[in-house]
């Protein structure tokens, strides 16, 4: 049902920003001088320099703070083999390693799956607690208003109660969490009086021994107390004097009479949930002293369940460390971790994690658990862009508890990155060198950068030269060397970097600024536009906004600034904090105040022209004019998804959820958030709940979207048609109805109802849903009207601002040479699209140019190792008899998707052939 998808979700990659932190011209907030500048429309670009305009001397790419294997395919292949052959106790940390390796791809769903698998295979409670909190943080649930950190959201993998049980939970996320069906407070109130325990059976047994605390007595049953542990049994039935007396003085044991009374009750009914927390603490001490294992476990569980907020966690954690009670400590850690990122800024929490005492006391959990704990904390800190002393301590703890090479290399490299941001270049260089000595070659880029920052430009250049000469070249190597090169050689390095890895932002930005400085204004815009049309980021839009402002085009500048704020509302730009009054000042100078109707007309126009950046800007303006129009935030999220800005899209959805004015509206947004995580059944449930409250277009649309994602037969697919028809009966605007009609056409195609599909697409086109031309072209093609199909796609190309997908699709309806031209154009416009590489490789393979076919696929794999491309290259290797490389590509592909049926078959076949050849050779020997 892929045809029903509205949005193409590409795997996002690391954004490379230009940094101006070393620039003396950067102002603190940018507003006073900027306001002055706004009064001069004809100002030249040079007058912008004091305001922080990026010059070529100031531009440099940031150092990536994650693992970057020198051969990612080989690393993935190796990981897959180790995961497949791992024991139950090894699997969890291998999935964590997979997460660390795949961070460079930036695929949120893939990374979440790694964490989920790690959580499923985790055995120890502390590890389960960390993974559970990590999964929760990954979804940014802390941004949802009204959701408490210790709430269960219905997902078993993130449930705070489920995490506190020992052992693997391999099916933890296949079904919803059942904890909501259990009584919320299964332990009762702390204020329950012990006297009420008389209501329980078993308490009427006659007492035959008393434990005295001062003048008070706790009457007990000798046999029941003896059954609690061997020490008690020896004391009460052994050769000790206590075995022959009916009263035992316990005054010197530091135990209160209330605790002894509680011990009596526990010995009879085996429950501790009746007692106050203070009493349970005493029972736990007594259990530790007299080796009452069952009592100790019960007390730990009771205390762990009572740790429900930060204050209690801070109170209990010291005791948990002193008594080395794993469960209670895990419960305290869980509260700290589920409060992230806020707890990173809590002095008491950070004092605990950063203290040398805690480091020593936490060690009893095992180095694996403690490494995981500090790794998670440090990753949250990296995402929060912390460069404080606390951040360095967290990374240092991560390094201290690291045991494998990848763990040590990653923590050292990240310490280098933080120290580099702090401008402590000598210390940063030391850590980068250590990381590189452990096999992390990318850390040498950090070494060369710190050399450069310390005035050793030639030394930095030589190091990168050595790297390029001794390893398979990567785009980042040439990008890094370009910083230390000059003139024509610098531009050659940048060109090579773009050729090897077109996703790198820095080369485009450098060339754009350079051309602008050389007064090649048109070429400067073309250069930055090349990047923006396939990889949208705040940094790139910011640069283009500067160019527009410098050339006096304030309207285009304002459009890009609004898009920047849509992507990142708190983005720092123009040498200081982006402020609303700057946008307002530009608005006042660009256009007259638009009415709501004018904005809708403009949004309709830009949406229809597939001008997503301009559409984002209009939606931002409409929200600024009237923030109460919450449905616009949902539209914003759709646009951001289409632009492959998944993080920003999910933030918009969370904001819409927070500001929803009705339960039905909130359920729809919650459904989309669940859908994005892959929870189709839960999404359907939310859609049904929303429909039961209020029949709305968005609720029916969500239901249809989720249904179409399931494996349905023909009868079930027809249900999707009915749901979409119900959606179209509900009030909505033309933009959304156009999308519904477009989806309806896709369903009709799947059902073989081509005439109905044609009607649906034409109706969508009538209300200016231009993307429906792609569906209409498909209908014509299926009706053997290839010429008409090609013409429809040509119309889409002519009318659309974003053309790469249209060129790619038109290639399916053209003759071979024309198809190749279209696919070449698609690659030029959007090098992230992998289908053109696969098509060209298949053509080369058909022409028996096997080496060139493999090289074509290798180009794409070098910067985007995607499943289908790896599978195809594996098939080519198999066809040419290179079975070892075929196996390696299959393993790398299966590391991305272990259930991909075709790759599994190819992998099995390649291994069988290789084994057969080995056996033949062995027989000849």
Curated annotation (Swiss-Prot):
BP-aspect Gene Ontology terms: ethylene-activated signaling pathway; negative regulation of ethylene-activated signaling pathway; protein ubiquitination
UniProt superkingdom: Eukaryota
Tissues in which the protein is found: Constitutively expressed in green and etiolated seedlings.
Gene3D superfamilies, alphabetized: Potassium Channel Kv1.1, Chain A, Tetratricopeptide repeat domain
Pathway: Protein modification; protein ubiquitination
The keyword NAD belongs to this UniProt entry's keyword annotation: no
Ranges in a coiled coil: 509-533
TPR repeat residue intervals: 409-442, 538-571, 664-697, 738-771, 773-803, 834-867, 869-900
Entry keyword annotation includes Repeat: yes
Keyword tags: Coiled coil, Ethylene signaling pathway, Repeat, TPR repeat, Ubl conjugation pathway
Residues covered by the BTB domain: 207-307
Domain notes: The BTB/POZ-like domain may mediate the interaction with some component of ubiquitin ligase complexes.
Biological function: Potential regulator of the ethylene pathway, which acts by regulating the stability of 1-aminocyclopropane-1-carboxylate synthase (ACS) enzymes. May act as a substrate-specific adapter that connects ACS enzymes, such as ACS5, to ubiquitin ligase complexes, leading to proteasomal degradation of ACS enzymes.
Record protein name field: ETO1-like protein 2
Origin species: Arabidopsis thaliana
């Amino acid at each position: 049902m892929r045809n029903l998808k509205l949005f193409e979700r590409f795997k996002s990659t690391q954004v490379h920003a230009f940094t101006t932190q070393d620039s003396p011209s950067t102002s603190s907030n940018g507003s006073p001088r900027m306001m002055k500048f706004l009064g001069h429309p004809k100002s030249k670009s040079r007058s912008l320099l004091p305001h922080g305009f990026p010059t070529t001397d100031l531009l440099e790419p940031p150092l990536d703070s994650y693992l970057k294997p020198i051969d990612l395919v080989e690393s993935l292949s190796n990981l897959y083999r180790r995961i497949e052959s791992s024991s139950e106790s090894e699997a969890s940390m291998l999935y964590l390693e997979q997460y660390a390796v795949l961070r460079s791809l930036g695929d949120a769903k893939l990374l979440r799956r790694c964490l989920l698998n790690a959580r499923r295979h985790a055995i120890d409670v502390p590890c389960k607690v960390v993974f559970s909190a990590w999964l929760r943080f990954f979804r940014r649930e802390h941004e949802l208003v009204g959701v408490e950190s210790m709430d269960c959201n219905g997902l078993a993998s993130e449930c705070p109660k489920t995490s506190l049980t020992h052992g693997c939970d391999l099916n933890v996320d296949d079904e919803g969490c059942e904890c909501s069906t259990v009584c919320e407070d299964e332990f009762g109130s702390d204020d329950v009086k012990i006297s009420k325990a008389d209501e329980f059976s078993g308490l009427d047994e006659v007492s035959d021994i008393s434990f005295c605390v001062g003048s008070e007595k706790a009457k007990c049953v000798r046999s029941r107390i003896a059954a609690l542990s061997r020490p008690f049994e020896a004391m009460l039935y052994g050769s000790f004097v206590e075995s022959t007396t009916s009263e035992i003085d316990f005054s010197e044991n530091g135990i209160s009479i209330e605790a002894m009374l509680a011990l009596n009750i526990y010995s009879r009914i085996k429950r501790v949930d009746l007692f106050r927390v203070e009493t349970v603490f005493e029972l736990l001490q007594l259990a530790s002293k007299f080796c009452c294992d069952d009592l100790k476990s019960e007390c730990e569980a009771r205390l762990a369940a009572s740790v429900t907020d930060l204050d209690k966690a801070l109170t209990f954690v010291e005791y948990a460390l002193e008594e080395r009670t794993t469960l209670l400590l895990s419960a305290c850690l869980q509260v700290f971790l589920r409060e992230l990122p806020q707890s990173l800024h809590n002095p008491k929490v950070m004092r605990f994690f950063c203290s040398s005492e805690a480091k020593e006391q936490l060690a009893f959990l095992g180095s694996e658990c403690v490494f995981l704990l500090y790794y998670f904390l440090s990753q949250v800190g990296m995402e929060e862009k912390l460069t404080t002393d606390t951040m360095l301590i967290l990374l240092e703890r991560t390094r201290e508890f690291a045991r494998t090479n990848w763990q040590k290399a990653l923590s050292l490299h990240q310490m280098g990155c933080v120290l580099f941001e702090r401008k402590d270049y000598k210390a940063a260089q030391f850590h980068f060198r250590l990381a590189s000595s452990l096999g992390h070659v990318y850390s040498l880029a950090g070494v060369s950068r710190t050399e450069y920052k310390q005035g050793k430009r030639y030394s930095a250049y030589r190091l990168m030269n050595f790297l390029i000469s001794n390893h398979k070249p990567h785009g980042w190597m040439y990008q890094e060397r370009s910083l230390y090169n000059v003139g024509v050689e610098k531009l050659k390095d940048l060109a090579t970097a773009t050729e090897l890895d077109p996703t790198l932002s820095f080369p485009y930005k450098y060339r754009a600024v350079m051309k602008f400085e050389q007064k090649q204004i048109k070429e400067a815009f073309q250069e930055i536009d090349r990047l923006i049309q396939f990889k949208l980021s705040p940094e790139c839009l910011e640069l283009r906004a500067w160019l527009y402002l410098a050339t006096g085009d304030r309207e285009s500048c304002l459009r890009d600034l609004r898009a920047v704020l849509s992507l990142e509302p708190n983005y720092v730009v123009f040498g200081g904090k982006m402020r609303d009054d700057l946008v307002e000042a530009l608005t006042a100078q660009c256009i007259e105040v638009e009415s709501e109707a004018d904005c809708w007309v403009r949004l309709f126009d830009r949406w229809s022209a597939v001008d997503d950046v301009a559409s984002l800007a209009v939606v931002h303006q409409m929200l600024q004019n009237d923030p109460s129009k919450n449905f616009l935030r949902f539209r914003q999220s759709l646009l951001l998804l289409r632009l492959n800005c998944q993080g920003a899209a999910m933030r918009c959805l969370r904001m819409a959820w927070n500001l929803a004015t009705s339960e039905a509206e909130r359920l729809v947004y919650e459904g989309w958030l669940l859908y994005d995580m892959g929870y189709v059944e839960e999404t359907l449930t939310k859609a049904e709940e929303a429909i039961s409250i209020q029949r709305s277009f968005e609720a029916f649309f969500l239901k249809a979207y989720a249904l179409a994602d399931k494996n349905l037969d023909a009868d079930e697919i027809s249900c999707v048609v009915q749901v979409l028809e119900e959606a179209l009966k509900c009030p909505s605007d033309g933009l959304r109805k156009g999308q519904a009609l477009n989806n309806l056409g896709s369903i009709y195609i799947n059902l073989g109802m081509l005439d109905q599909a044609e009607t649906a697409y034409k109706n969508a086109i009538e209300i200016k849903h231009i993307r429906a031309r792609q569906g209409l072209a498909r209908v014509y093609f299926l009706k053997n009207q290839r010429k008409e199909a090609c013409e429809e796609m040509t119309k889409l190309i002519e009318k659309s601002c974003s053309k790469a997908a249209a060129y790619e699709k038109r290639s399916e309806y053209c003759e071979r040479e024309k198809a190749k031209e279209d696919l070449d154009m698609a690659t030029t416009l959007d090098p992230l699209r992998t289908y053109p590489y696969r098509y060209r490789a298949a053509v080369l393979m058909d022409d028996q140019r096997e080496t060139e076919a493999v090289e074509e696929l290798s180009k794409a794999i070098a910067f985007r190792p995607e499943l289908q491309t790896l599978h195809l290259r594996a098939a080519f290797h198999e066809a040419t008899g290179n079975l070892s490389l075929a196996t390696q590509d299959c393993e790398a592909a299966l590391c991305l998707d272990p259930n991909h049926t075709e790759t599994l078959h190819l992998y099995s076949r390649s291994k069988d052939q290789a084994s057969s050849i080995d056996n033949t050779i062995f027989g000849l020997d």
